[in-house]
């Protein structure tokens, strides 16, 4: 593709010739509808297109195909529409003139009635009976016009201003439909209704009976569609398509529904009230009310009985690059992110946390959002299988007092001031019973107390299992530093830290009491164990953050203003785990840290899916029987081999892995140790060496070989040895030297290693550890595998076959091939 700096203009001559059209056409000519033409078959039979680029066959065929296709579409769709619209413009000038003259003649002949004179009854009857041939006094109604134009509000309003009255005597009326959908016809589609004088309204209806006997149109022919038969009677026939203009209006979301309902209900209510307020109904009003025209259905219905639309909730999410995005909140059908109003979360979902339910009871002293449940909290774990608590039988005082179903932009900060006590301020004995009925996941009261104290009493009632593990590690770890500041004086003065860490050996009941004492120092229940002065405040503990700490860390809400309002001795709590501000009252300038994931619950949930079993489904298995262990990664090579050897004197001496130490390197992390002077796998001459093998792939290890030489080989029973010669004497080989040739009588592999380890422990030469296994075949060798399986296949022979081929290629001089059958 070429990028031109300026537009490239290519002159081209194009000529269309040899047009040939042939088709069956249905042609309908009407004074009212104009000319309608429909092609039943493809009209274009042939067209020749010549251009400047006819010499290029590809371009010529492309131009021919494209232009011919466009012409066929034009004849089928565009040409009938063009002809129809042009004919309507011509019919409009011809049709409106006679009716205009009729109206003027009727005005001259008939005297105008008095304004208070009602329309006589026989006239209405004659109009209804002769509706098939009478002239309609109302033109084609526009769908976009208000619907109150078709109604009369009072008897005196019949002769009101002309702009409130519909235009009269512009088109003939269609016959009454047998389907019952419509009884009113449509006038000329493009004819502009003439504005008449107010006195024309009554006189034109009088003259309609005199001209009824002279039909000037043929409705059955005019309303016949040659393609689909009779046209729909209730649809407008104007070609301007005003009825479809609302389809192209800008989308306002759910606001469109509310505006439509309000406008429709208001217009219906106004129309009905105006109609009922009138003292009497005229014949025209009764006729218009009883008719079933397409545009009158909305005005004849009763008041709006549909339920109101629910209030649109909006959520605010942080935008990329700064700022926020406010959008309508979408709650899916199978999502429990937000409970419906009036439904208790305890009854709807039994798997709720005790701390959550207890925290939703208000303190009773403030009328603020004490019991509000923000959707952010409910969406943490709507039906969390990790914490399957059975809370259906909770006392009534622990039920939430008021549940808020506000949007996500509701302030969740004040929720931390909720007190897990009854409204009377006392302590209920049922609480300890319910606290001990924890089920499924090992998320005990002790762990809850530890977690709540580490997070500074935050509102995060659904902690992630990773957070629990991390806080459990912190609470059970030993405090190595001894010069920690003593907080006993501050505790005696009444301003000490209320959050201390219970030890791992404390009972659940003690941790439970400490939890409530630490959360609410004003409680009358004393703790069962005294506070320890050596307890470390949460900020002084060094957190061990894992790789997934940034993604799996739960966002905690900060309790600053509301909590400080009820507890002046408490300072603001910084809930950022990486914050250096402590939570003890000595620091009054603790900051509030809110993370961006606080408002975006979907991304917050998705960030925790670090494993395959972490899903958003409520049917996921719990972590009850899972054991997660972490350790350093083990690679393949000498660095990952753990080898220790002990000499006879009892002093452990680490050996070296590799050829320099005389031991072979095995693939998959196998290290073989050799003592001073060398030795076999488990025993050496003069020294007793114990070699430890740690790693993988011990069955495929080769002594004295590198990684490339320890690939397992298949074996065969009978092999023709290529370039074979007698093995050389390896008695003079230096320690660590390895002969890689003439392996016809040497054994490598798992069976030989097992042989040397079990049967031939004393067969090694002792010169080097790498020569273990490189020995003459022992007298008692294992039976080949084919003997047990009953097949003719021996893996050892096939290994020797491929090894001998490799050795033959390495020979500098060609060796004549000899076929010696191995016994």
Swiss-Prot record:
Record has Transport as a keyword: yes
Amino acid composition bias (Basic residues), ranges on this chain: 496-509, 774-784
GO CC aspect terms: ERMES complex
Domain of life where this protein originates: Eukaryota
Region feature Disordered, mapped onto this chain: 97-127, 157-221, 263-289, 357-377, 473-588, 627-663, 718-823
Comp. bias intervals (Pro residues): 110-121
Annotated localization: Mitochondrion outer membrane
Alphabetic keyword roster: Lipid transport, Lipid-binding, Membrane, Mitochondrion, Mitochondrion outer membrane, Transmembrane, Transmembrane beta strand, Transport
Principal place of residence: mitochondrion
Record's compositionally biased regions (Acidic residues): 479-492
Biased composition regions of type Low complexity, renumbered to the chain: 161-175, 197-217, 359-371, 521-539, 570-584, 635-657
Annotated signal peptide: none
Membrane-protein topology: Multi-pass membrane protein
Keyword Protein biosynthesis among UniProt keywords: no
Biased composition (Polar residues): 546-561
GO molecular function per UniProt: lipid binding
Domain remarks in the Swiss-Prot or TrEMBL record: Lacks alpha-helical transmembrane segments, suggesting that it resides in the membrane via beta-sheet conformations similar to those predicted for other outer membrane proteins and porin.
Subunit: Component of the ER-mitochondria encounter structure (ERMES) or MDM complex, composed of MMM1, MDM10, MDM12 and MDM34.
Protein's UniProt name: Mitochondrial distribution and morphology protein 34
Organism: Coprinopsis cinerea (strain Okayama-7 / 130 / ATCC MYA-4618 / FGSC 9003)
């Amino acid at each position: 593709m070429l990028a031109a700096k300026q537009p490239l203009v290519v002159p081209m001559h194009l000529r269309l010739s040899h047009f040939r059209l042939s088709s069956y056409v249905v042609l309908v000519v009407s004074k009212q509808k104009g000319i309608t033409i429909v092609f039943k078959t493809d009209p274009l039979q042939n067209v020749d297109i010549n251009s400047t680029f006819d010499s290029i066959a590809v371009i010529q065929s492309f131009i021919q195909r494209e232009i011919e296709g466009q012409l066929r579409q034009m004849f089928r769709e565009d040409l009938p529409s063009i002809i129809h619209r042009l004919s309507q413009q011509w019919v409009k000038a011809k049709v409106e003139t006679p009716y205009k003259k009729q109206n003027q003649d009727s005005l001259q002949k008939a005297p105008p009635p008095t304004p208070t004179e009602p329309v006589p009854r026989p006239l209405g009857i004659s109009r209804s009976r002769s509706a098939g041939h009478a002239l309609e006094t109302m033109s084609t109604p526009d769908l976009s016009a208000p619907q109150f134009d078709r109604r009369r509000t009072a008897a005196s309003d019949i002769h009101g201003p002309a702009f409130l009255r519909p235009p009269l005597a512009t088109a003939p009326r269609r016959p009454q439909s047998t389907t019952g959908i419509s009884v009113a016809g449509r006038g000329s589609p493009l004819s502009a209704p003439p504005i008449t004088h107010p006195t024309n309204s009554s006189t034109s209806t009088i003259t309609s009976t005199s001209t009824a006997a002279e039909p000037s149109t043929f409705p059955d022919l005019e309303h016949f569609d040659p393609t689909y038969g009779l046209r729909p009677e209730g649809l407008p026939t104007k070609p301007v398509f005003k009825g479809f203009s609302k389809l192209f209006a800008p989308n306002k979301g759910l606001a469109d529904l509310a505006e439509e309902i309000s406008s429709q209900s208001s217009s219906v209510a106004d129309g009905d009230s105006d109609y009922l307020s009138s003292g009497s109904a005229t014949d025209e009003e009764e006729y218009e009310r009883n008719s079933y025209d397409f545009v009158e259905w909305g005005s004849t219905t009763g008041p709006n009985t549909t339920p109101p639309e629910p209030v649109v909730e909006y959520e605010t999410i942080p935008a990329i690059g700064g700022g926020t995005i406010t959008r309508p909140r979408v709650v899916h059908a199978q999502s429990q992110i937000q409970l419906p109003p009036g439904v208790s979360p305890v009854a709807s979902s039994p798997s709720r946390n005790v701390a959550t339910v207890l925290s939703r009871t208000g303190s009773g002293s403030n009328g603020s959002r004490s019991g509000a449940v923000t959707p952010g909290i409910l969406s943490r774990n709507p039906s969390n299988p990790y914490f399957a608590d059975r809370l259906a039988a909770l006392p009534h005082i622990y039920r939430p007092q008021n549940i808020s179903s506000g949007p996500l932009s509701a302030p969740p900060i004040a929720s931390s001031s909720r007190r897990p006590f009854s409204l009377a301020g006392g302590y209920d004995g049922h609480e300890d019973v319910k606290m001990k009925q924890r089920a499924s996941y090992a998320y005990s009261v002790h762990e809850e107390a530890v977690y709540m104290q580490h997070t500074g009493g935050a509102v995060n009632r659904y902690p992630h299992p990773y957070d629990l593990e991390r806080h459990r590690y912190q609470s059970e770890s030993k405090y190595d530093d001894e010069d920690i500041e003593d907080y006993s004086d501050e505790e005696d003065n009444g301003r000490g830290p209320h959050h201390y860490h219970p030890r791992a050996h404390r009972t659940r009941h003690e941790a439970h009491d400490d939890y409530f004492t630490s959360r609410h120092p004003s409680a009358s229940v004393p703790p069962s164990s005294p506070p320890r002065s050596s307890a470390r405040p949460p900020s002084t503990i060094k957190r061990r953050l894992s790789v997934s700490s940034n993604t799996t860390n739960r966002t905690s809400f900060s309790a600053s203003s509301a909590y400080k309002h009820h507890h002046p001795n408490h300072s603001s709590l910084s809930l950022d785990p990486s914050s250096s501000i402590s939570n003890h009252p000595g620091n009054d300038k603790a900051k509030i840290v809110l993370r961006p994931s606080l408002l975006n619950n979907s991304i917050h949930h998705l960030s925790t899916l670090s494993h395959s079993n972490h899903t958003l489904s409520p049917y996921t298995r719990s972590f009850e029987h899972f054991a997660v262990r972490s350790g350093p990664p083990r690679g393949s090579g000498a660095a990952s081999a753990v080898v220790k050897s002990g000499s006879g004197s009892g002093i452990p001496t680490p050996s070296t892995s590799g050829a320099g130490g005389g031991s072979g390197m095995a693939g998959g992390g196998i290290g073989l140790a050799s003592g001073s002077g060398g030795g076999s796998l488990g025993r050496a001459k003069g020294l007793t060496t114990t070699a430890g093998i740690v790693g993988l792939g011990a069955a495929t290890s080769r002594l004295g070989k590198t990684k490339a030489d320890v690939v397992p080989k298949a074996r065969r029973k009978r092999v023709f040895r290529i370039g074979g010669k007698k093995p050389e004497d390896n008695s003079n080989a230096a320690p660590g030297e390895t002969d890689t040739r003439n392996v016809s009588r040497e054994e490598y592999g798992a069976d030989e290693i097992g042989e040397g380890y079990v049967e031939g422990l004393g067969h090694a030469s002792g010169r080097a550890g790498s020569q273990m296994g490189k020995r003459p075949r022992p007298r008692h060798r294992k039976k080949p595998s084919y003997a047990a399986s009953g097949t003719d296949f021996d893996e050892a022979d096939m290994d020797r076959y491929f090894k001998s081929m490799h050795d033959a290629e390495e020979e500098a001089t060609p060796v004549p091939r000899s076929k010696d059958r191995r016994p």
